[in-house]
Amino acid sequence: MTIRKSNPYLSLVNSYLMDSPQPSSMNYWWNVGSLLGLCLVMQMASGMFLAMHYSSSMELAFNSVEHMMRDVNAGWLMRYIHANGASFFFMCLYLHMGKALYYGSYKSPRVLVWSMGVMMFMLTMATAFMGYCLVYGQMSHWGATVITNLLSAMPFMGGDLVPFIWGGFSVSNPTMQRFFALHYLLPFILAALVVMHFMALHVHGSSNPMGMSGNMDRLPMHGYFVFKDLMTVFVFILMFSLFVFYSPNTLGHSDNYMPANPMVTPPSIVPEWYLLPFYAMLRSMPDKLGGVMAMFAALLMLLMLPMTDRSVMRGNTFKMLSKLSFYLFLFNFFLLMNMGQLHVEVPFIELGQFATVYYFSYFLMLVPVMSSMENMLFYMGNK
């Protein structure tokens, strides 16, 4: 017996990454999971080096970032890898979740895998938000002020919760130090959730584009899908390098290159692009509490999907009605992303409200209705 099978530690790696049987029909959409693992390792490694030179003091935070850019050997490279890596991380996250929505990877028996993935998504959003605040530029300060102020909408305890998070009466030095401590800690919790995600996936194995059992035709992970993953890894590194070396600030915000000034409000307070859809839902509600509830409910909708999808078939490969509603949902998501960066004025307010209504209608109405109609067509076709 080879050492990779006899060693108690290597045997775990072998069963998960080498001899793990995978459906032979898996296409390139299943490669995004390996890209997410690469992004996580890349973010943790670059973040560790940045933390060696970063100061979480409010007076020194912005200057310490500039010090990395100008005086630290390859500091600019680490900073741009970390900043653009966050954007590419969310690109891969949205692609991975879109694949799961289209191919029905959330359905039984993989409900736990999907639930763990949604929790990882929410934790990644929290980590990214706190990391964005640590630069302590103009947009970072006001983004931290606006988002933390949302908690004041909570009944009874909101007014006390916000000063507790701030560590004072406004975003100040204790806030920055708390955000830095949490931003350093949360990726390790995320890595633990990734392991749990792997464990849940290993029970029933990966799904496939056909939406049926792949037990009849499976191939080992190593030798087939490992080299297939390497193809997308090389493409990812090429695209990532183009941004890091040639256009490092395209995915950022120019206002964040100005030191934070609590006395001057930016013309518009806009988060990073990957948070814009949920920020658009927040802004589309005329009531503060309603906006906060809509933003958090939009995330919780993802957890309800295994219960609202009543289809007897997994995925949208052979379902035209569900395929059409999914493409409309995709267009609506990009519309929300665009609405989140525009000024709060007519007609963008109404467009954001319509897009928010469709987002919730997709999960609460379209998916159950379409799946029930397609079940009827399926049973009628079998008679």
Swiss-Prot record:
Any one of the GO CC terms: respiratory chain complex III
Domain of life: Eukaryota
PANTHER family listed in its UniProt record: CYTOCHROME B
Pfam families reported in the protein's UniProt record: Cytochrom_B_C, Cytochrome_B
Amino acids binding heme b b562: 82, 183
Topological relation to the membrane, as annotated: Multi-pass membrane protein
Entry keywords, A to Z: Electron transport, Heme, Iron, Membrane, Metal-binding, Mitochondrion, Mitochondrion inner membrane, Respiratory chain, Transmembrane, Transmembrane helix, Transport, Ubiquinone
PROSITE patterns tied to this protein: CYTB_CTER, CYTB_NTER
Annotated heme b b566 binding sites: 96, 197
GO biological process, alphabetically ordered: mitochondrial electron transport, ubiquinol to cytochrome c
Membrane-traversing stretches: 32-52, 76-98, 113-133, 179-199, 225-245, 289-309, 321-341, 348-368
Cofactor names: heme b
Record's function text: Component of the ubiquinol-cytochrome c reductase complex (complex III or cytochrome b-c1 complex) that is part of the mitochondrial respiratory chain. The b-c1 complex mediates electron transfer from ubiquinol to cytochrome c. Contributes to the generation of a proton gradient across the mitochondrial membrane that is then used for ATP synthesis.
Organism: Debaryomyces hansenii (strain ATCC 36239 / CBS 767 / BCRC 21394 / JCM 1990 / NBRC 0083 / IGC 2968)
Cofactor: binding details: Binds 2 heme b groups non-covalently.
Assembly: Fungal cytochrome b-c1 complex contains 10 subunits; 3 respiratory subunits, 2 core proteins and 5 low-molecular weight proteins. Cytochrome b-c1 complex is a homodimer.
Keyword S-adenosyl-L-methionine in annotation: no
Family under the similarity heading: Belongs to the cytochrome b family.
Binding residues for a ubiquinone: 202
Protein name, UniProt field: Cytochrome b
Something else known: Heme 1 (or BL or b562) is low-potential and absorbs at about 562 nm, and heme 2 (or BH or b566) is high-potential and absorbs at about 566 nm.
GO MF assignments: metal ion binding; ubiquinol-cytochrome-c reductase activity
